[in-house]
Amino acid sequence: MGSAATSPPPSMKLAQEDLKRVAAHMGGAAASPPPSVKLTQEDLKRVAAHRAVEFVEPGMALGLGTGSTAAHALDRLGDLLRAGALPGVAGVPTSLKTELHATRVGIPLLPLGGDGGPSRIHLSIDGADEVDPDLNLVKGRGGSLLREKMIEGAGEKFVVIVDESKLVPRLGCTGAVPVEVIPFGAPHTLGLIRKVFDGLPGFHARLRMVRKDAEEDTPFVTDNGNYIVEMFFEDGIRGDLHNISDQLLRITGVVEHGMFLSMATTVIVANKDGTITVMDKKN
């Protein structure tokens, strides 16, 4: 994307309450807010999400992300739709949770493909668990990585909204890198995933487990009826990410992984000092 792509239409300005809290500045530099402003992490998520919604234009088909940051974008879209500011806008949800949220705030929904689906997805807006210097992402710690990657990979533009705690030098630095696997033979698939990183110091992988009430731990189940393997790295993933991606996807039983490589076109970062940084994908 060039610099022109980061200029929102005049009608999509931030809400006044957000303008009072933070001054946005495009192109990677950050504007200074009043020194008295104190923003919580939720405030930062909200400001970044509202900034991303400025990219939405009437008639667009959107990819609707999942997670706490994306939820703020859904709320903002609902407000604008009810105000009549975004006629013809509809979205494809990346999870059942997002489907319910979007329905609640009045966002019309579309399927991905088929007779009722859009001919194209113009723009997707979603959060991320990690963003590296090349705008590669880790996503899906909430378990929605497969639908997220399908929908966001089908779009023309993918705007990612994060606070600065999500910026990392390497993917895998701050927590699990998820891999969605089919339930049949999941322990076997887990063993094959471990072999990809055999001998790597500090690496370990496990099935994500959940406990319901006082019952025993059971595998976490995604919206697609699959399990999640969590991969942990002592100091992040080193090496060729695309090669590692290929090795994982060649394992029979692996459905998809949570490394979103070369997919984000714009990343909007809300900094803890109240400034916003917008980073565009290099051509």
Task: Describe the role of every protein-language-model region.
Residues 2-6, 14, 18-33, 39-40, ...:
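Conserved phosphate- and dinucleotide-binding cores of soluble alpha/beta proteins
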Residues 52, 64-67, 91, 138, ...:
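Buried hydrophobic positions in well-ordered alpha/beta secondary-structure cores of metabolic enzymes
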Residues 59-62, 83-91, 136:
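Short active-site oxyanion
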